[in-house]
Amino acid sequence: MTATAPVTAATAPTPEATLAPAAPVATTLPLSPPANLRDLGGIAIAGGSTRAEFAWRADDLSVIDDASATRLMSAGLSTVIDLRSIAETEITGRGLLGAYPVAYHHVPFMASISSAVDHVADPSEMWDQSRFAQMYISLFENAAPQIVTAMAVIAHAPGAAVFHCAAGQDRTGVLAAALLLAVGADSDAIVTDYAETGHNIAAVSVR
């Protein structure tokens, strides 16, 4: 594991740091496993688009195979941000990427998966998609320090960064939304990126 210097929100980059002339970019990397990994490059923002390979979002990277890990490294990966709880990381670990020279940052957005249930009146409602918006708002509020930390890590990464949770949908989706909002993406672009997970979630679920 490569050590990294402490980072703070105060030194986060301006939106211009990720601007590039708009150009078609394939936003989904053909890597499996994981099943929900994609580049956040090529997303329209004011003045251009996000730079390809500055950040990826993903589902559980502990399942990555050697060929996929090698390809990520070849694409400039320098930093992994793990949003899972301590219990989740103890079950599956870091996977093969743990053997590569990348900085690893564990920034758990929840103390445990069960803590997500604590913020809804009826735990069964947690899986009601009509209530996802409220769940994400609660996650923004309760994990605000972690969101700031993760964004600062991405800003100061010497190469590309990838952040992930277990399915790459909720915690990862919240961080992706915060990141895209910070660099100037509009709500439609953020929702479009989030919706891409819908095409991949079945493969994540069967795994």
Model-derived regions: residue spans:
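Cys-dependent protein tyrosine phosphatase-like superfamily
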Residues: M1-A161, L175-R207
